[in-house]
Design a protein with these regions (language model features):
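RNA pseudouridine synthases
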Residues: 2-319
Length: 319
């Protein structure tokens, strides 16, 4: 499906000296930089009626004329997949992602993803890069994610993430008993030998995780983590680096630790917990239009509640 878009903007004095692609991003903010650059290269976005290059310098007072065809992003199929929508308005959504849901199609997961579900939920997201997704959760991590419904909203939310002004808190259940909370400041990059894994490495990107103890058990601990950065697998890598890997983590968790004398139901759940015990519980950001502070919080999912119940019962029984 396609539609024609037409718009005209005069370059203000404040953008004198700017490149054409930079000025276009300011003046036609409903469209992504990538799309605008393609239109410039195709001659569908002109300067005073003449095709120019994206890097062309502007002097001010030029007329930028847009006449282009928008093709909806049909690379990915809209699929009727249930979403737990916590909040939604005209520009932003907050969802509670289920375990097992991949965020974006990739090799091995061509469909059935959050992106496919979002395209079905709101068809206009086909015009927003990545269907409005601005950050990710791992496949088996549950909890809160924000989604932009317009390009300007996406730009604003990404800027907040880059400025580290978005607050993201996670609950995790780890192997071991940290004495107290701590801050882990260690760079993360791709593992040198295993492409599926990340690792703490001097060549990695800066990564900072704060955690505090919520509840201690005989051999495990419920912790609450707060991210300053958003590296791939960050909490999982950092907690494993600190020697407190997450229960159930297939990449970083290692062998299950069974408390001495533990009852069979606890042994079973510790051996067979099907995913990393990690949940994005709280999300705070500024609304991309109003600037209002938005705070959302969701309860732990049933599988983590059951795990904590078994650990708590074991601790109380074996006192």
């Amino acid at each position: 499906m396609s539609r024609i878009v037409e718009d005209t903007q005069r370059v203000p004095a404040t953008l004198a000296g700017a490149r054409l692609d930079q000025a276009a991003a300011e003046l036609f903010s409903d469209y992504s930089r990538e799309r605008l650059k393609a239109w410039i290269n195709a001659g569908e976005l002109t300067v005073d009626g003449v095709q120019a290059k994206p890097k062309a310098k502007l002097h001010g007072d030029e007329v930028l004329a847009l006449q282009a065809t928008i093709e909806d992003d049909t690379r990915f199929e809209a699929q009727d997949i249930a979403l737990d929508v916590v909040y939604e308005d005209d520009t932003v959504m907050v969802i509670n992602k289920a375990a097992g849901m991949v965020v974006h199609p990739a090799a091995g997961n061509p469909d059935g993803t959050l992106l496919n579900a979002l395209l079905h939920h709101h068809s206009a997201l086909a015009e927003v890069p990545r269907a409005g997704i601005v950050h990710r959760l791992d496949k088996d991590t549950t909890g809160l994610m924000m989604v932009a419904k317009t390009v300007p909203a996406q730009t604003a939310l990404v800027a907040q993430l880059q400025a580290r002004s978005v607050s993201r808190q996670y609950d995790a259940v780890v192997i071991g008993k940290p004495v107290s909370g701590n801050t882990i400041d260690a760079p993360i990059g791709r593992h040198p030998k295993d492409r599926k894994r990340q690792a703490v490495t001097t060549s990695g990107k800066p990564a900072v995780t704060h955690f505090r103890v919520v509840e201690r058990f005989r051999a495990h601990t419920h912790v609450r983590c707060k991210l300053e950065t958003g590296r791939t697998h960050q909490i999982r890598v950092h907690m494993a680096h600190a020697r407190y890997p997450l229960i159930g983590d297939p990449l970083y968790g290692g062998r299950a630790k069974l408390p001495p004398g533990a009852a069979e139901p606890l042994k079973e759940i510790l051996r067979e917990f099907p995913r990393q015990a990690l949940h994005a519980r709280k999300l705070i950001f500024k609304h991309p239009v109003s600037g209002e502070s938005m705070m959302f919080q969701v309860d732990l999912p049933d599988d983590l509640l059951m795990l904590l119940d078994y650990l708590r019962e074991d601790s109380e029984t074996m006192r």
